[in-house]
Design a protein with these regions (language model features):
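Cleavable N-terminal export/targeting peptides
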Residues: 1-24
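Gram-negative and organellar
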Residues: 22-408
Length: 408
């Protein structure tokens, strides 16, 4: 809670310091009240216990725009009452605050952000659809980044700066971390549609369990072959050295293509990234993913397949292979009444356990605008797990939620 208050206070101070300038300012308080029924509140595979969860969520959204400062803040205070006392009543927070200061126009910039939210303990598996608390932890990430933009020539753009990232977890075995990052990005415009790119990043991370230093170097191109359609690719290497003297040398890449048609947009991306892992230092993820979006007169349809390999970076051991796809549809029945449906199928292969887990998620919703900025929504979520050998990965959960929300 102290971190949330500090972030909100810093945001307000920055705004107050610039209120004298011509600026746009909006503040919208809100209040949401919801009731949830779940038939497996503890996500047990043998002892299924149901519960009713009442949530009261006052919040506020602030937007500020001025010549040298922009900022957005969204905060929700979340009180949760469990009617059958299967879990202690709790207070949760959701904060997203971002600000950008421009002390010297087109040259010197300062970005700052704070993200406080509840996240999954498992970096390979998002559990937010299944429960409000099982296998989850509260995380706060504070980021501050001063950077410069240089234009040595009309065709060349250089961006260099420093990024400070502090990651904290609360009431958990998760590992706190602090990152100091220096970076240099270069783009050279060969023509209006074709550019060469090069990126270098140095990261120094300190944590309770171990520290490491990492260099990343990438080079490639970006080509816009038609209006809003483009292709990009970068390849390079990452050199990681732990203070415990272990050294790793990994090929990395980042590539993708986006094709825009009249009502259809197709995107495919692939790359290697280092994910924040609550239970470890970092997790290396090699991935291929795509999405096809079809815009309808009153809604949209999308299909998004994906494949990822998660490697325990320090030991260089493959932990999980994940295959999955999501089909999503959204439709506006009237100007005030809309609905949505998502179906996700995933398979998690876990070589270290000699088994796999299959997961299916069905997420459906209806929303009706009762009056101006007053809405009523219904949400039903079904989650089903199956594993031939992992006993705890055989369970299913039904969640039904009704919510009324007023924005002022």
């Amino acid at each position: 809670m102290a971190n949330v208050l500090r972030a909100s206070g810093l945001f307000i101070v920055l705004l107050a310091a610039n209120m004298a300038q011509a600026a746009e300012f909006e503040a919208h308080p809100s209040l949401a009240v919801s009731e949830e029924f779940t038939d497996n509140v503890l996500e047990s595979n043998t002892n299924r216990i149901s519960d009713y969860i009442t949530r009261v969520q006052p919040g506020i959204a602030i937007t500020y725009k001025a010549p040298i400062l922009t900022g957005d803040l969204s905060y929700v205070f979340d009180y949760r009452n469990y009617a059958k006392n299967n879990h202690d009543d709790e207070i949760a927070h959701a904060l997203s605050a971002k600000a950008e200061l421009i002390p010297v126009k087109d040259f010197l910039f300062l970005e700052a952000s704070d993200e406080y939210q509840r996240v999954s303990l498992d970096a390979t598996r998002d559990t937010s659809k299944e429960s409000l608390f099982v296998n989850q932890v509260d995380r706060n990430i504070v980021t501050a980044s001063p950077y410069f933009i240089f234009r040595p020539t009309l065709r060349m753009r250089l961006k260099t700066g420093y990024r400070f990232i502090d990651t904290r977890y609360f009431k958990s075995i998760a590992i706190d971390k602090t990152n100091h990052i220096g970076y240099l990005d270069m783009a050279y415009e060969v023509s209006k549609r074709f550019s060469l790119t090069a990126d270098y990043t140095f990261t120094r991370e300190t944590a309770d369990v171990d520290n490491y230093s990492q260099h990343q170097a990438l080079g490639g191109f970006r080509y816009e072959y038609s209006d809003k359609s483009f292709l990009f690719a970068q390849a390079g290497n990452a050199w990681t050295r732990y203070d415990s003297r272990q050294r790793l040398n990994n090929l990395i890449w980042n590539a993708g293509i986006t094709q825009v048609f009249n009502t259809v947009t197709c995107t495919v991306i692939t790359g290697v990234k280092y994910d924040e892992d609550p239970l470890r230092i970092i997790m290396q993820e090699s991935f291929v993913s795509g999405i096809i979006v079809k815009n309808l007169t009153r809604g949209s349809l999308s299909f998004s397949p994906g494949y990822s390999e998660y490697v325990l970076t320090k030991s260089n051991i493959l932990q999980t292979k994940k295959y999955g796809a999501t089909v999503h549809g959204q439709y506006d029945f009237t100007a005030d009444f809309s609905g949505g449906l998502s179906v996700t199928g995933e398979k998690f292969e876990q070589p270290l356990l000699g088994s796999y887990t299959r997961r299916v998620i069905v997420d459906s919703s209806l929303s009706y605008l009762l009056a101006r900025q007053l809405s009523l929504s219904l949400n039903y979520i079904y989650v089903d797990y199956y594993s031939p050998k992992i006993v705890t990965d055989n369970r299913h959960i039904n969640r039904a939620i009704i919510e009324i929300k007023k924005t002022f």
